[in-house]
Amino acid sequence: MNRNCASPEEGGTTEQLVKEASDIVERDGFENKKKPPTLKLEHVEVVGEKSPTPATVYDLFKKYKKPDIVTNSNGDDMNVGFDQLSSDEKNGFLRKLQMLTVSSRKSVKVVGESTPSSAGRLLKKFAPSRKPTEKISVDEPPSRFNFFGRSTKKLSDSDRPSSLPKKKSARRLLFGKEEQKPEPEVVKNRVLPAMTSQQSAKGAPIPINKPYRYQGPRGSLETPTDSPAKISSNSSSSSPIPPVPTRNHFTSMNEESPSKKRTFSRQGLSNRDNLSNGSWHGELPPRDYTSPTFSRKIFVGGVPWDITEAALKDSFGEFGSCAVEWPGQEARYRSGQSNIAPLTNLRNQSKYAGQAATGYVYMIFEDERAVASLLHECSQEIGGAGEWYFKIRAQRSKSTEIRQVQIIPWVTSDSMFCEDESLLETGIEPKRTVFVGALHGMMTAQVLHWIMEDCFGSVECVQLDTDKFKYPIGSGRVTFREHGAYFKAIEMGYLHVHTSKFRKRVQIDPFLESTSCMVCTTESAQCFCRNRNCFKYYCHTCWAIDHGKDNADDVHVPVIVPSSASKAYAGPHRRPHLTSNSLSKSHGCSTNNQLSHVLSPGFPMIVGGPSQTLSALYGYIQNNQQMMLTPAVYETPMTPPSNESNAKRRSFTEFQNPAIFFNPSSMMTPQKSATCSETPVPAFFTNSAAFLTPNSNYYGSPNHSSSNISQSPQQYYGANLYYGYMPPQVAYDGSTNGSKLSPIHVPHIPNYQ
């Protein structure tokens, strides 16, 4: 009991004693809690480095404290008096303070951090740590891993390499070196921004996503520098294969909303400011679609030259009923006419004379879902422009060969591209529209829109022509917003498109329509002058008056208005079977079918007569159109080389009506605008061709009935088919001695349109 407490003998009551005792206990407990226990430290003399190292910073401050320094009465702060220390004391104080506060081996404990529990320490002991472990003694016993070139010895920080190479996955897209982050969540969050920034820096095209409203075709698949027997392209790549063979699953992960406006990052090397050579260089963007609608017709490239129709149907028939369409169907028509002109084609000398040795075919399915199922079984490459690859079986004499072929489907939404949807209702402006021909099969309407806009100016609308299967035929129309861009494209006349997949020479001509002569306004227009000074529709009479005095240096070449030379044919007389391989040798059998396949689908055809006094005509004859003219056959070459004398040249038979002349044998056809270095006559190229002669009252017609025969001869351009079309030979009867030819008269067909 404390002596301050009152005893009962001194007169204190029991209650007072208890109260005083409780107050003393509470006061003693409060004082014990307030005052920390005193640290018992040995006296250490300040002798520099020989002094023992203090345990804490508090001890260090207490060690260097001067007795004459006034401290805070509360004891919270301690003034060492650093300014009163000697230089040795300052250096020793700072060195010891650094040893206590900064340690390379011990981490500083954060204020408020809880002490790890026993479970946490156990987890930290067995869980893999990101920090390098301590170095193990070299004198450890040998391990079984040493026999295989491995050691259980762990590396220290100095022995460990700074950056170890990572394994690169074959399916992973690498966008440069990423900054290594210790936390995987941070690295994961950087993937999408890195992809976006890197693709923008490289100028990679953004995937094209088309709305459903567009209907689309594909162009011709021949390259102008190659023969028709070569396929258009062997190199291709495309985006990953969809998991389900339904059109709803042909969607890319990087796909945008169809309603969102898409841009195209061009990689072109030439633009409208660098178009002096008439070339455009660039890359096709990858194509991704949302719920595409495929054409029932597909392109199959890289097929063996001796592939049979049965082998193709056997390979593709598992996806649905299909038929084979040979390109151009030339060989099937030639096969029945070997008695007229012997052919040197290797295919026609073999048992496979019923097929065309072109290296590609077209497969036509009954249902578009069969195309989706086929694409599900195809392989692709990342970043392609719409090519797929499929393996077919080709039967050989002693074995079966597995051949990988190229599959190019066509999405019907690629036939039209208009930035302004109101044009679909109001229609396009013909006076700002050009006709483009010889388009490549990978050029969609949107791709053509970008190319023409990049070269000439703002484009309003692009439409591509298709066949009855909604498959492209290689031609289209481009409408510009301004007349300046329109005239610039017309004056250029052609455009060389260069990509890593193909090179194509695209022909550009004014889009012609049925109208009257702009001079007399009474006769219907038969031709159009594309020269900038004229740029009018003419009838034959007005053309002879306005252009009868043209000199050889300034020749205006007229463009034939298609409606004046041909009309659209509905097709009731077309061949009902896609693979029919015979042509009648008789005179009057299936003449209409012969003529319906003479015309090249969408290829530009220059037509004219081989007369020195005949001015050149050229124009386009559309697909599924038939000539409303009387044909005739001419045996010998129509345009011999320039070194031949005029005596060897044979003239046309004089007809009072327009006529088409076919040359069964190979002839020398001059390339338009290609001049020879030795003579002013254009360079010649071997090809077969068809010629259209004008009316008898036209200037320079074969019968020389025109009053303009006294005019000087003008340069003649023969048929130019750009290596993409070999017309079938037409059966005829009668002698070809001299200049006497027997024409084949076309029976009257009442259902011409």
Swiss-Prot record:
GO MF annotation: an example? mRNA 3'-UTR binding
Name the UniProt key words of this record, in alphabetical order.
Answer: RNA-binding
Say which domain of life the source belongs to.
Eukaryota
GO BP terms, alphabetized: negative regulation of cytoplasmic translation
Extent of Polar residues compositional bias: 265-279, 578-589
| Xref: Pfam families | CEBP_ZZ, RRM_7
Cite the record's Basic and acidic residues compositional bias ranges: 131-142, 175-188
The residue ranges of the RRM domain are: 298-320
Q: Which InterPro entries match?
A: CEBP_ZZ, CEBP_ZZ_sf, CPEB, CPEB1_RRM1, Nucleotide-bd_a/b_plait_sf, RBD_domain_sf, RRM_dom
Q: Where do the record's region annotations for Disordered lie?
A: 111-286, 567-589
Xref: CDD domains: Bbox1, RRM1_CPEB1, RRM2_CPEB1
Start-end of Low complexity biased regions = 227-239
Q: Which GO terms describe its cellular component?
A: cytoplasm; neuron projection; nucleus; synapse
General function of this protein: Cytoplasmic polyadenylation element binding protein that binds to and regulates the translation of specific mRNAs.
PANTHER family reported in the protein's UniProt record: CYTOPLASMIC POLYADENYLATION ELEMENT BINDING PROTEIN CPEB (PTHR12566), CYTOPLASMIC POLYADENYLATION ELEMENT-BINDING PROTEIN 1 (PTHR12566:SF9)
User: What name does this protein carry?
Assistant: Cytoplasmic polyadenylation element-binding protein 3
Organism this protein belongs to? Caenorhabditis briggsae
Q: Gene encoding it?
A: cpb-3
